């Protein structure tokens, strides 16, 4: 992901992404550069300009994963809370989950 982000930064800066430019961005960010990963990135994008890569990426993001809102999915209705009595304090005691969905973008 870091290599792709570096590629995007070079492309968005108005330049044509090159291996040396991507490596320079990675080094500036303190990321150890693996030349084989840079080569694999450019092999994947061979023959495509930056705009084409962005357009293809956006089309793949359209069908993203959705999940119900945790507050509406787990919150009991007023009638259910009144009838269950003891269940309401147990539900209130639950801890909230971290909503980062495990992406760890900058780990």
From Swiss-Prot:
Q: How is it modified after translation?
A: Phosphorylated.
GO terms of molecular function: structural constituent of ribosome
Q: Which CDD domains match?
A: Ribosomal_P2 (cd05833)
A single Gene Ontology biological process assigned to it is: cytoplasmic translational elongation
Output the Gene Ontology cellular-component terms: cytosolic large ribosomal subunit
Database matches in InterPro entries: P1/P2_N_sf (IPR038716), Ribosomal_P1/P2 (IPR027534), Ribosomal_P1/P2_euk (IPR001859), Ribosomal_P2 (IPR044076)
Disordered: annotated span: 85-107
Give the record's keywords alphabetically.
Phosphoprotein, Ribonucleoprotein, Ribosomal protein
| Family per similarity comment | Belongs to the eukaryotic ribosomal protein P1/P2 family.
Describe, as the record does, how this protein assembles with itself and its partners. Answer: P1 and P2 exist as dimers at the large ribosomal subunit.
User: What function does this protein fulfil?
Assistant: Plays an important role in the elongation step of protein synthesis.
* Name of the featured protein: Large ribosomal subunit protein P2-A
Q: Which organism is it from?
A: Trypanosoma cruzi
Q: What is the lineage of its organism?
A: Eukaryota, Discoba, Euglenozoa, Kinetoplastea, Metakinetoplastina
């Amino acid at each position: 992901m870091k290599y792709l982000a570096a590629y995007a930064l070079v492309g968005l800066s108005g330049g044509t992404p090159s291996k040396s430019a991507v490596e320079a961005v990675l080094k500036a960010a303190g990321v150890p550069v693996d030349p084989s990963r840079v080569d694999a990135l450019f092999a994947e994008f061979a023959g495509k300009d930056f705009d084409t890569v962005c357009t293809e990426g956006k089309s793949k993001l359209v069908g993203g994963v959705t999940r119900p809102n945790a507050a509406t999915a787990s919150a009991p209705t007023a009638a259910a809370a009144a009838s269950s009595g003891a269940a309401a304090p147990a539900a209130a005691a639950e801890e909230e989950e971290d909503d980062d969905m495990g992406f760890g973008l900058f780990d």
